Regions:
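Well-ordered alpha-helical scaffold segments within catalytic/enzyme domains
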Residues: 20, 80-93, 142-157, 191-204, ...
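Catalytic-core region of carbohydrate-active enzymes that cleave or remodel glycosidic bonds
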Residues: 275-299, 322-374, 385
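Low-complexity, Ser/Thr/Pro/Gly-enriched N-terminal "stalk/linker" regions
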Residues: 1-75, 100-120
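Solvent-exposed loop and edge beta-strand segments that line ligand/cofactor-binding
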Residues: 3, 59-76, 127-140, 173-188, ...
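Solvent-exposed beta-strand/loop surfaces of large extracellular or lumenal domains
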Residues: 487-512, 531-537
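Extended ligand-binding groove/face enriched in aromatic
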Residues: 57-71, 77, 81, 86-189, ...
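Beta-strand-rich binding/interaction modules
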Residues: 472-495
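C-terminal beta-rich recognition modules with glycine/proline-rich loops and embedded aromatic residues
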Residues: 12, 211, 289, 351, ...
Length: 642
């Protein structure tokens, strides 16, 4: 377990990287204003939100009825959190003023006892706290707490923080194991993360302790939600209270060994577990996290960093069950996976956590947003088929193109808050030094050194760290060496001199410890095209091959490859080349050109004894995150091999 972590990184790390800074500029210029209009129902032709109107109604500022999902409040919370991080990246007085006005409305919507939730305030005030399984009161509170902490950190304004501290006190008075309290747990984990953020910015131990209560209490009574339903006698969605694995209530967190149930609920819980393990130096809780991490990432995760194999419960299924065309792989789940990975790094600086964080960031998360920032995927498939995907039973959730918005719109604002707080995922600062998890271009000002990273990652493997020391003490600069880099293949120079790093790599990190002055560390990661094969236990991918270059997963689209994608076979020694796209939507991206055989059916018979005709051709593969931006067409990550 690590000591001396310094979590407040947002104001220390500025993203300068062309790739990620481009995303941040897109979010600030397009996505945040677009989502603000969505929340105000100002965009025609997309799903109605009504989220801000709900707050105005609850505040008594206008007349009307509640509209939306029971967790509609969380869309506003995540938007506010994203706005806070955006204001750190690029101050914007007008945006801040609009956010302040939203916060004023939220404050007025809070009830006298500290309670805050527009659904129950407007629609069912008599049912408050009676349906933790289905109704997301604690979930919404958690997201608003995260927003409050972020807004306070960045702007210094504490109005929303005071609102959510009142809500936290209200929750603390109601839930717990003490006499007179309800031993409740959230139906959707998130309150734990919100409370930990309040603890982070206020230092108040009771918030941390309450978060631990919610984690420790889960699964102690697997029948809690059964009893709750019997007691209240009414339902909202008729969720199956007997499916205890759905919300990870089937066992205590220490007894859970497999990633099960709703994938977002799971990774939010795992994130809180990992953070609590770090804060309390709890080896037992960290080991519980390790067990879940190992099962999830080694047996239940897609090559893209997607998790959740089925639409039924938006959930994990069983080991090695990873279908490509009926997949779920919700954007929020991959975001939660990044949260979990980052908190695991706070316990142990282990490259396997940075590897998964990198995989999800460059693939299964940004695939959830269109390149123009105005459309979004909830589900991130690895195979689509026009006429089937989004249309036929069993495939309706797998859309071939991104829609403008969703009734359940959890993913778009989640993408925003992650991208705008990216700096704290790229670096860690500890008492003994700093650690670079992903070699993206940054300007970082730490306590013991300043670091500027020059990089064109993920397209180019050359990365240069410019270090200016601030202390006479020896200090560590740790640089993650991705697991896709073959041992001995990375080139390292320090102040122009070649360095053998064989003895300096610990758990996937190059550890450089010295008194830093004005120094330069240059690394060259070999960015070769790699053929990837799945474990044969993954039946859908047996006999298939996928392609990666650096951290990027590639896919094939019909728009680039005429005919049926299933008709192409890639032979074992196929020639593979790369080229930089010079124009269009994918300008600047590295494309792959791969030799293949194309099979064509002879005649029109459904079945025939005549073998298909084979011809040689060249396929084009594009980065997975870019798919679906050029119209509806076929897409596949895994291609048939020979």
């Amino acid at each position: 377990m690590r000591d001396g972590l310094k979590e407040r990184l947002l104001n220390k790390v500025k993203v300068t990287d062309k790739f990620w800074r481009g995303y941040q500029e897109l979010v600030m210029d397009t996505v945040i204003p677009y989502q603000e209009k969505i929340l105000n129902d100002e965009i025609p032709g997309v799903e109605k939100s009504h989220a801000l109107a709900n707050f105005r109604i609850a505040a008594g500022l206008e007349e009307g009825e509640f509209y939306g999902m029971v967790f509609q409040d969380s869309d506003v919370a995540k938007w506010l959190e994203g706005v806070a991080y955006a204001l750190e990246v690029r101050p914007d007085a007008e945006l801040e003023e609009r956010a302040d006005k939203v916060i004023e409305i939220i404050e007025k919507a809070q009830q006298d006892d500290g309670y805050l939730n527009t659904f129950f305030t407007i629609k069912e005030p008599e049912h408050r706290w009676q349906n933790l399984q289905e109704c997301h009161e604690l979930y919404c509170a958690g997201h608003m707490m995260e927003a409050a902490a972020a807004y306070y950190e960045v702007t210094g304004k504490d109005r929303l923080l005071h609102v959510m501290e009142r809500m936290a006190e209200h929750i603390g008075k109601r839930f717990g194991t003490e006499e007179g309290k309800e031993p409740g747990i959230p139906g959707h984990q998130e309150i734990e993360l919100g409370l930990l953020r309040l603890y982070e910015v206020t230092g108040k131990e009771n918030y941390k302790d309450l978060a631990r209560y919610f984690i420790e209490q889960r699964g102690k009574d697997p029948d809690y939600f059964v009893k709750e339903r019997e007691k209240r006698g009414w339902v909202h969605f008729d969720m199956d209270v007997h499916n205890r694995e759905y919300n990870q209530a089937h066992a205590t967190v220490y007894e859970q060994k497999e990633a099960v149930g709703h994938s977002v609920r799971a990774v939010y819980m795992y994130t809180a577990m990992a953070e609590l393990a770090s804060l309390y130096k709890d080896e037992k809780l960290y080991q519980a996290c390790c067990d879940l991490w190992e099962n999830m990432t080694q047996k239940r995760m897609y090559i893209t960093g997607g998790i959740g194999s089925t639409v039924d419960g938006e959930a994990f299924t069983i080991d090695y069950d990873l279908p490509n065309d009926t997949v779920y792989a919700e954007t929020c789940a991959s975001i939660g996976l990044v949260f979990f990975a980052r908190k695991m790094l706070d316990n142990v600086m282990d490259g396997r956590y940075a590897d998964v964080m990198e995989r999800a960031l460059y693939n299964g998360i940004i695939s959830g947003m269109q390149l123009d920032g105005k459309k979004f995927f909830y589900v991130n498939p690895l195979e689509t088929e026009p006429g089937v995907s989004g249309k036929l039973y069993g495939y309706k959730h797998v859309l071939p193109e991104r829609p403008g918005w969703y009734t359940c719109a959890c993913c778009p604002p989640n993408v925003v808050r992650l991208l705008m707080s990216l700096g704290k995922y790229l670096w860690s600062e500890t008492e003994d030094g700093v650690y670079s998890h992903i070699p993206a271009g940054t300007e970082a000002h730490f306590d013991k050194m300043d670091v500027t990273v020059e990089s064109n990652y993920p397209w180019d493997g050359r990365v240069t760290y410019h270090i200016t020391g601030k202390t006479e003490e020896e200090t560590i600069l740790g640089i993650h060496i991705p697991s896709w880099v073959r041992p001995g293949s990375v080139q390292v120079r320090i102040n122009g001199k070649v360095k053998d790093i064989t003895a300096d790599v610990e758990k996937g990190y190059l550890i450089l410890k010295r008194v830093w002055e004005n120094d330069e560390v240059e690394l060259v990661f070999p960015m070769k095209i790699r053929k990837i094969y799945a474990n044969l236990k993954v039946r859908e991918d047996a006999g298939c091959v996928a392609f990666m270059r650096g951290p990027m997963v590639y896919c094939f689209e019909g728009v680039d490859n005429p005919g049926l994608l299933q008709s192409y076979h890639i032979f074992e020694d196929a020639k593979m080349e790369e080229e930089v796209c010079k124009e269009g939507l994918l300008e600047g991206s590295v494309l792959l050109k791969i030799k293949a055989r194309k099979l064509e059916t002879v005649g029109d018979s459904l079945y025939s004894e005549v073998a298909p005709v084979r011809t040689l051709t060249t396929l084009t593969a594009v980065p997975y995150y870019t798919w679906g931006n050029r119209g509806e067409n076929q897409m596949r990550v895994w291609m048939r091999g020979e």
